[in-house]
């Protein structure tokens, strides 16, 4: 377990480079199982979730390493289709292995996936999609067993535009006979990045980024593939919010400004001035943010649920009253009570939080309940008067590569301790 000590009251000022996207890297790592040659992934973030995915790949017989932001993977000698329970139950992204394992071996076995406890996140859409492709899916003694020696293309209508289900179906359908069309598909940039990678392998994916994706089943080409992971829009949004909550001024490089439109819009509403250029962005913020009247989390291109906690932290010191509605997950306000320990004023019922901004927060001992909530605690600590201690800070490592070091380089004073 790790803890973080934040000394508040320092503005975030300077330049930072945005890392590769966690939510793009994880499904792409899974997709290397259906490559027919070595794969090199650049801008691959060094995160605990990425390390766990590499451990799963190694357990299946895949050769892989991650050094200096580049992952090297060769799945030529992969021979197992049963994922280790000890690892797969720790991270939700282990579910991404089902599609590629089915496509390559005709069989996949895993435990129910783990991850942050942020509400009910059913995997029924994943399993329903695989069944539509012809897989037999059953549960035995807490394990998910999928079998399908010959997957067949199908028309699949998703009840909800689930990112993970869309990605799993894409990977399995790439290896199936015939054409698969996914309707009501997720439109997130990470979907498009996975499609680009699959196309680079030699598969045929069209329509990614829209609500209808077509996958023409076939074989990958026998070749080496190099792919660059897209920039992480949530890391970018978190750093932008760090500048906004401290009244700072920040320049971000390696950022795709098209992917963060909804985040930038809310920070502009809070009073920040944002200018964008080719692969870069500059944000300059007032000493205290304005209220953000209403924010509702939505699937892309709406405001991302993965930025809700960070925006909540910003609203706690805003001039006026802000309202946030969490439409994606029903249990994603656990950070609210922790912010209350720091002096935040709010009421929360069901999916709606009404936040009344206070002049300043006060440092306190708080707990990170999940990845993004931990990031929100860190942001709140930056603006608070005095010192803030965040317990279970290791959860932040699931989505940020040494976030405390990045912020320290921008003027923060943060000390991390391993307990």
Each model region followed by its residue ranges:
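Short, structured segments at the rim of ligand-binding sites
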Residues: 1-419
């Amino acid at each position: 377990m790790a803890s973080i000590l934040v000394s508040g009251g320092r503005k975030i000022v300077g330049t930072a480079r945005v890392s590769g996207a966690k939510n793009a890297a994880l499904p792409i790592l899974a997709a290397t199982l259906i490559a027919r040659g070595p794969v090199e992934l650049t801008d691959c973030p060094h995160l605990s979730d990425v390390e766990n995915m590499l451990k799963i790949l190694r357990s299946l017989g895949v050769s892989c390493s991650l050094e200096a932001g580049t992952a090297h993977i060769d799945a030529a000698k992969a021979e197992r289709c049963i994922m280790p329970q000890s690892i797969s139950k720790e991270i939700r992204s282990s579910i991404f292995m089902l599609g590629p394992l089915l496509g390559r071996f005709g069989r996949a076995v895993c435990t129910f996936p783990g991850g942050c406890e942020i509400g009910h996140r059913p995997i029924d859409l994943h399993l329903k999609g695989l069944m539509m492709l012809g897989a037999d899916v059953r549960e035995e003694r807490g394990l998910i067993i999928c079998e399908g020696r010959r997957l067949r293309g199908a028309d699949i209508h998703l009840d909800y535009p689930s990112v993970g289900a869309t990605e799993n179906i894409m990977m399995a359908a790439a290896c199936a006979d015939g054409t698969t069309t996914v309707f009501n598909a997720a439109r997130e940039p990470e979907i498009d990045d996975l499609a680009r990678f699959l196309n680079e392998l030699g598969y045929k994916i069209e329509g990614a980024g829209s609500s209808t994706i077509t996958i023409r089943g076939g074989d990958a080409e026998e070749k080496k593939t190099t792919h660059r992971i897209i920039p992480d829009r949530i890391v970018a949004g978190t750093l932008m919010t760090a500048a906004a909550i401290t009244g700072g001024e920040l320049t971000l490089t390696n950022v795709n400004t098209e992917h963060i439109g909804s985040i930038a819009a809310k920070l502009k509403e809070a009073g920040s001035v944002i200018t964008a250029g080719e692969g870069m962005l500059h944000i300059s913020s007032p000493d205290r943010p304005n209220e953000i009247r209403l924010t509702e989390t939505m699937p892309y291109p709406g405001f991302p649920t993965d930025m809700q906690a960070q925006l909540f932290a910003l609203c706690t010191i805003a001039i006026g009253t802000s309202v946030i509605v969490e439409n994606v997950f029903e249990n994603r306000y656990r950070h609210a009570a922790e912010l209350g320990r720091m002096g935040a004023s709010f009421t929360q019922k069901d999916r709606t939080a009404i936040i009344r901004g206070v002049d300043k927060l006060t440092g306190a001992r708080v707990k990170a309940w999940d990845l993004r909530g931990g990031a929100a605690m860190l942001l709140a600590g930056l603006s608070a008067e005095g010192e803030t201690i965040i317990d279970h800070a290791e959860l932040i490592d699931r989505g940020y590569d040494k976030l405390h070091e990045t912020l320290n380089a921008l003027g923060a004073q943060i000390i991390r301790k391993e307990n």
